């Protein structure tokens, strides 16, 4: 694991008057880059030719670093360019997927916003479950084996795959039938099936809750919420049940978009308590814990209980739903505030207070 001292030694060589904010051109990079510009930073977008169109059209990137493949971001020459540009990298789901978690932890020698140690805790289901449970959050019942299935379950797989390959089953037989079908279609592998995460299917309404923890203020902020727009399930439910049966289509849960939502106000104390508990436990289990953005993906059942089924320990894709600010982020200072701008504001404050060691790794 790259040490904090190694990163601070690199940062000490930076020109502090020319700090840039960099990220991979994907996932949540539009508001990360735009937010940085609004806070006065120059921005760097790592991208491929042909994939640079949105960042040029929206004019959010001051500099481009072109790669043949997104996975090239881990290469030493790209790291050297980022260091030459005095870059602080903001990680997101695509960055972690393409760079590779092992590389992020052990060989990506560029200062990153946040705690790079905690990223494994969102990626590995066992660690994620440990953190959520020990924080005292309500989580779905977990099944250790397909043979244990005794009710309706949802089957998920490791990594940031945006819901691809997820399926619902109500018996051991149905699990193996659907898994085999997805394998034949090239969506799952034997390794995926062996590592399947099987959990209770919770019936409820979806709230993906976007928090920001500021180490500088020691405060958990609520910036926004969204629900997921998924294919093909959200199209499938528009078809009458009789026709669905005749069509014999297997539902899938691939995230294709995000829809902003607000939660009933009486549930906000529960929302804040969940964020506070997670931050406190993360400090204990994975010091220094959460830094900056994190997300709790939850379902609200008919008893008005929020059940957390997934966690993001970095900026989540749903933050795209409030690029120009949202109802909750507006309440803090009466201004439109995206997650990207909130990240940049924390970096700017840390530079001004000479507390950059509190927010980078």
Swiss-Prot record:
Listed pathway(s): Purine metabolism; IMP biosynthesis via de novo pathway; 5-formamido-1-(5-phospho-D-ribosyl)imidazole-4-carboxamide from 5-amino-1-(5-phospho-D-ribosyl)imidazole-4-carboxamide (formate route): step 1/1
Ranges annotated as spanning the membrane: none
Gene3D superfamilies (alphabetical): 3.40.50.20, ATP-grasp fold, A domain, ATP-grasp fold, B domain
Disulphide-bonded residues: none
Annotated GO MF terms: ATP binding; ligase activity, forming carbon-nitrogen bonds; magnesium ion binding
Highest taxon of source: Archaea
pH dependence comment: Optimum pH is 6.25.
Annotated Mg(2+) binding sites: 297, 310
A GO BP annotation: 'de novo' IMP biosynthetic process
Cofactor note as given: Binds 1 Mg(2+) or Mn(2+) ion per subunit.
Subunit structure: Homohexamer. Dimer of trimers.
Family stated for the protein in its record: Belongs to the phosphohexose mutase family.
Entry function: Catalyzes the ATP- and formate-dependent formylation of 5-aminoimidazole-4-carboxamide-1-beta-d-ribofuranosyl 5'-monophosphate (AICAR) to 5-formaminoimidazole-4-carboxamide-1-beta-d-ribofuranosyl 5'-monophosphate (FAICAR) in the absence of folates.
Protein's recorded name: 5-formaminoimidazole-4-carboxamide-1-(beta)-D-ribofuranosyl 5'-monophosphate synthetase
């Amino acid at each position: 694991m790259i040490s904090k001292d190694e990163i601070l030694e690199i940062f000490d060589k930076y020109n502090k008057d020319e700090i840039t904010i960099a990220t991979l051109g994907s996932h949540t990079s539009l508001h990360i880059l735009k937010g940085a510009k609004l806070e006065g930073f120059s921005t760097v977008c790592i991208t491929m030719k042909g994939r640079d169109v949105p960042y040029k059209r929206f004019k959010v990137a001051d500099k481009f670093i072109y790669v043949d493949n997104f996975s090239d971001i881990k290469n030493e020459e790209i790291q050297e360019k980022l260091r030459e540009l005095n870059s602080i990298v903001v990680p997101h789901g695509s960055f972690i997927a393409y760079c590779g978690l092992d590389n992020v932890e052990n060989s990506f020698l560029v200062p990153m916003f946040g705690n790079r140690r905690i990223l494994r805790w969102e990626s590995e289901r066992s660690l994620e479950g440990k953190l959520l449970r020990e924080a005292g959050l309500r989580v779905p019942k977990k099944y250790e084996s397909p043979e244990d299935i005794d009710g309706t379950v949802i089957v998920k797989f490791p990594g940031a795959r945006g819901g691809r390959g997820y399926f619902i089953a109500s018996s051991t037989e149905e699990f193996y039938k659907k898994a085999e079908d997805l394998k034949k279609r090239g969506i799952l592998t034997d390794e995926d099936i062996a590592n399947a995460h099987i959990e209770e299917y919770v019936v409820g309404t979806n709230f993906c809750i976007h928090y920001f923890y500021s180490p500088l203020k020691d405060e958990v902020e609520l910036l926004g919420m969204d629900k997921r727009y998924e294919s093909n399930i959200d199209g499938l439910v528009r078809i009458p049940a009789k026709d669905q049966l005749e069509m014999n289509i297997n539902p899938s849960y691939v995230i294709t978009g995000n829809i902003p939502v607000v939660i009933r106000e009486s549930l906000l104390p529960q929302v804040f308590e969940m964020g506070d508990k997670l931050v406190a436990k993360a400090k204990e289990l994975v010091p220094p814990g959460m830094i900056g953005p994190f997300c709790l993906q939850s379902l609200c059942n008919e008893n008005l209980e929020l059940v957390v089924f997934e966690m993001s320990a970095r900026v989540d894709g749903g933050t795209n739903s409030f690029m120009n600010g949202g109802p909750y982020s507006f309440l803090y200072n009466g201004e439109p505030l995206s997650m990207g701008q909130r990240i940049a504001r924390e970096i700017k404050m840390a530079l001004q207070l000479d507390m950059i060691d509190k927010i980078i790794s």
